[in-house]
Amino acid sequence: MPAPHRLYPRSLICLAQALLVWALLAWAPAQASQELTLVGKAAVPDVEIALDGDDWRWLARKRVLTLGVYAPDIPPFDVTYDERYEGLTADYMAIIAHNLGVQAKVLRYPTREQAVGALESGQIDLIGTVNGIEGRLQSLRLSVPYAADHPVLVMPIGARRAPPADLAGQRLAVDANYLPRETLQQAYPQATLHYFPSSEQALAAVAYGQADVFIGDALTTSHLVSQSYFNDVRVVAPAQIVTGGESFGVRADNTRLLRVVNAVLEAIPASERRSLIYRWGLGSSISLDFARPAYSAREQQWMANHPVVKVAVLNLFAPFTLFRTDEQFGGISAAVLQLLQLRTGLDFQIIGVDTVEELIAKLRSGEADMAGALFVNAARESVLSFSRPYVRNGMVIVTRQDPAAPADADHLDGRTIAMVRNSAAIPLLQQRYPQAKVVTADNPTEAMLLVADGQADAVVQTQISASYYVNRYFAGKLRIASALDLPPAEIALATARGQTELISILNKALYSISNDELASIVSRWRGSDGDPRTWYAYRNEIYLLIGLGLLSALLFLSWIVYLRRQIRQRKRAERALNDQLEFMRVLIDGTPNPIYVRDKEGRMLLCNDAYLDTFGVTADAVLGKTIPEANVVGDPALAREMHEFLLTRMAAEREPRFEDRDVTLHGRTRHVYQWTVPYGDSLGELKGIIGGWIDITERAELLRELHDAKESADAANRAKTTFLATMSHEIRTPMNAIIGMLELALLRPADQEPDRQSIQVAYDSARSLLELIGDILDIAKIEAGKFDLAPVRTALRALPEGAIRLFDGLARQKGIELVLKTDIVGVDDVLIDPLRMKQVLSNLVGNAIKFTTEGQVVLTVTARPDGEAAHVQFSVSDTGCGISEADQRQLFKPFSQVGGSAEAGPAPGTGLGLSISRRLVELMGGTLVMRSAPGVGTTVSVDLRLTMIEKSAQATPPAAAAQATPSKPQVSLRVLVVDDHKPNLMLLRQQLDYLGQRVVAADSGEAALALWHEHAFDVVITDCNMPGINGYELARRIRAAEAAPGYGRTRCILFGFTASAQMDEAQRCRAAGMDDCLFKPIGVDALRQRLNEAAARAALPTPPSPQAAAPATHDATPAAFSAESILALTQNDEALIRQLLEEVIRTNRADVDQLQKLHQQADWPKVSDMAHRLAGGARVVDAKAMIDTALALEKKAQGQAGPSPEIDGLVRTLAAQSAALETQLRAWLEQRPHQGQP
């Protein structure tokens, strides 16, 4: 082991080397630094700080605080010139040094890193202009912030839209000394970062197109923009980064210095902080306040739905709105819109217009959402909604610089005054100076040109506009002569009526803008010729103020020592008082309902935040003022009334009072529960009143809505009762006749001849009941929107002739002349639903005959061509009793009737005919109008515009065509019939055989496709729902084969055939490639008609009409099926009937067995398909109960996932119905004569 004394020289050498390295490191920054003279605010304020004795002794020993700054400058925080250091940081450093009783020393370093190294080595005590992010990265301890640091985004003033929130694809320019790269990359990972040596260079890069977006702190950005780039860039949005504000940084171990610096900073009053901000021209910066107002949920939703708002502005309304030579929008309104953009996040798209009329038209048409600047007047308020005015300016008189020009307002009578067209001041001016002549111009420039050219003596304009135009365009020619005694003009934003959310958003945003900001914007555009003086112009004054401040500090130094002794005692009392006041403030402001306190003269002494929020005002606007003076209600008359009520209340009563009141605030009526409590002093003398209210508008509206809902429910119940009573009466009346007459007929002896008159009465009553039910169904269909017309080619003359023939006999019975008059020129056939048109005419003619006892009923038809259409009018006139106007208003309501003549008594019928007729005419696109007078008669006119159809030379009337149709076909079609249900297949085949067609049948889609490939068919009729290849797939495959290259056949006609009567079934068939859809069951005549239509479309031979069917047998029909349907389908062919029914019975029995097996296997899709098959079989014999059960089972089984008791019951019911149907069908067949019997 080496001797200890040999280690000493080596240890000393190492120690000496370490000291040398430390000295070199400390010497290097010291040599690089430059000492500057601190130039702070001239009048440095004294603040009360609480430090203990150790801190003051430490400061006495310290004597000097060294502040480190670095290049480049960060204005307005750091500004250096001529070895002087000033700026916002310098001002705060001067306050700290002054109040701590130490000297301030400033050392400037070339870089931030050198300044931080000097701080770590102890060469300086603190470093300025450090935000929270920088402090954390550099391991510094930061003081409380002395200035806000809101990062903001800046774009060129010509940018149309705000950048995307994540700045994706944007070139982001940033000061290298502002935010670390890691922070920016985390906030904007998709942006491209470009670092610059200073904020000014980074901002210039955006101004001149080298970068897209600049990010910097709000104060520095606002200072640079206002000083150098006001016309080039604008702040568009706050950045999504929180920095914590600008602070002083000290070493992490220097806690004492941090404590004393914080003590001074925290003691600086808010007024002094504002004064320092104003000192550097930042008091009205648009970048200092980014707090958004509290928007409601509906307002936030509106802004989310309308991110871009179109703003209409006048092209020349300087200095409010103007477009510079580079087409950039500017002016006072442009600056206000920038403020609103920051507070709303909306993107304003500017639309320039030339006149106020054009601007208002765009607002009302929706081409623009709002106006950027518009004078407020009563006429415009009737069509527009105005925001809070952001400029109020008096009116002035501008005249020529001529002794003969009017000197003031008293000399305007008899003079010619130029004004902007539609100016709000024109009626006021004409009222005040009736002898003056007013001429108008399109804009202020033209109005002033009229004065400059001698065409007018004076122009009346706002002071701001007048100053702007005179200074810039008419200097030396025009002058502002005097102010005008008219109400000040108000400039505001405007929207169309109904834009409730938008105008509320704008008002909230405007209220969040301080008056200082608005005043600064206005002053910037007032048109002053000279630039405001800078710091250099005030250097001597500032030095003088600093000297006076130091002298004042010496004079008050003696007072400070004395006051310190009292401060400690006072602070204890103040703290207790402040605690009590804070408790009272929280108690009052925390109450959600408005509360106020007024003295006995009605002046406001105290109010809570809820009161201010209700009226949207600040405390300064109401404190110390009466209700009329503050006028928060917006109506001076209402304000005076409320003030007088309050004074009367205090004078008359001393007891608390609680009452409900309706009050109108800013045009809105609110229902409130108001309370007032007079209060006095300890001697009982009245001092004022405490009051407040609870807004119960929503509760009152809910009660009103509940009452309205009850009234609506009662009305609906009464209507239901009336309807049921009417229906009961209308149904029971014919039923009484039917039952009574049939009962009498049954009571007659069997060998006696039947009473034909009784049977006729029963028959007529049954027809009346059938018409009633039909009318009710028509009304229900029309009201449900499910009533479809079926327009076809119709001979116009045939419609009225049919109505005349129908009612001719009834008219003869009543001795009434029934006349048809036609005036049809150039119109033959039209496109109309003949059945429904005949229904309308029958109702009108029948009503006319019903209410006419003598005279005549005239049906007049007039038709004239109108382009490609025809204007047709049907008019029914009678000489009956007539109808009063009151009764006419009721006639077109369902079940409404009016009496006939006094002798005739009540009118027969249901009261549905006219209601149905009017609705049918409206569905046809026409109108039905009634004109009538009591004792004169009634005329009902139907006006229609119908499509004309050219009449073919070979056209044959329908009746003649029917007669000319041969009984046997000359040429038949080749028809492929596909159905997996054998009764349906057999029936359709027999029907087509009867029509003379050549039929090939297939019981599956696969078999049909094979037959279609082997043979050529003209028509294919396929069931839609089949196992395997269903009808839709079969149609698609046939159409695909026809579309293939080399297909040599003629395209066949494809019909779907289905028992599903859903409204969209025909659409599904056409979508699959079919030509049309047929619905089961279908009669022979209907089948022939559809084949005729298909043959005509495809140019196929037209199938002939069948021979007339044999008369139907009138055997009694069992309840489970319809014998009439069977007879109609089979044309009363006995052999076909028996063959059809045997096949139905056999197939139903097999389908029921298969259904039960599938039900046991829980194969629900196949259960649904089998139910559909059973429904199709039931439709053949019109077994309604079985059809309903099968359809219900089909619907229930679709999508079923597990066992269902309801399906179990439906399967059992369907099986029982099938068995009952088989029994009844066999019994019915036994009753019929066999073929060959007589």
Curated annotation (Swiss-Prot):
NCBIfam families on file: sensory_box
Highest rank taxon of the organism: Bacteria
Signal peptide residue numbers: 1-32
All copies of domain Histidine kinase, residue ranges: 726-948
Protein name: Virulence sensor protein BvgS
Topology within the bilayer: Multi-pass membrane protein
PAS domain sequence ranges: 580-651
Kinase found in the keyword field: yes
Membrane spanning residue stretches: 308-331, 542-563
PTMs per UniProt: Activation requires a sequential transfer of a phosphate group from a His in the primary transmitter domain, to an Asp in the receiver domain and to a His in the secondary transmitter domain.
Function: Member of the two-component regulatory system BvgS/BvgA. Phosphorylates BvgA via a four-step phosphorelay in response to environmental signals.
Segments on the Periplasmic side according to the record's topology features: 332-541
Record lineage: Bacteria, Pseudomonadati, Pseudomonadota, Betaproteobacteria, Burkholderiales
Catalytic activity line of the entry: ATP + protein L-histidine = ADP + protein N-phospho-L-histidine
Gene Ontology MF: a single term: histidine phosphotransfer kinase activity
